């Protein structure tokens, strides 16, 4: 039996001080989350992630943003304190993708 996940407003989970929003100009109050996808292989993410999900990954290169935009993911969270290049942040800003780092 498959359980349906309830949607929450993204800003409700952002009050945790372990996370830092890096992208600018995105209205976090309007972002709705439908689930999570955890993985690091871009081809797997493209095949299995669903629109509205948050993607948890250690990948931090600009192609991550391209994949997130293609699938219409709610956000990308780069975990484990991995450094995110400025180029990736710039691409996230250009494409309107919510990019978050764990601290």
Residue map of PLM features:
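Conserved catalytic and cofactor-binding micro-motifs
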Residues: 1-48
């Amino acid at each position: 039996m498959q359980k349906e996940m309830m949607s929450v407003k993204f800003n409700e989970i952002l009050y945790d001080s372990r996370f830092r929003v890096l992208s600018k100009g995105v209205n976090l109050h309007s972002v709705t989350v439908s689930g999570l996808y955890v993985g690091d292989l871009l081809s797997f993410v493209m095949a299995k992630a669903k629109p509205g999900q948050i993607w948890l990954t250690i990948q931090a290169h600009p192609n991550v943003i391209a994949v997130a935009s293609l699938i219409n993911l709610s956000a990308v969270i780069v975990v484990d304190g991995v450094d995110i290049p400025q180029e990736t942040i710039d691409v996230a800003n250009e494409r309107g993708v919510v990019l978050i780092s764990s601290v």
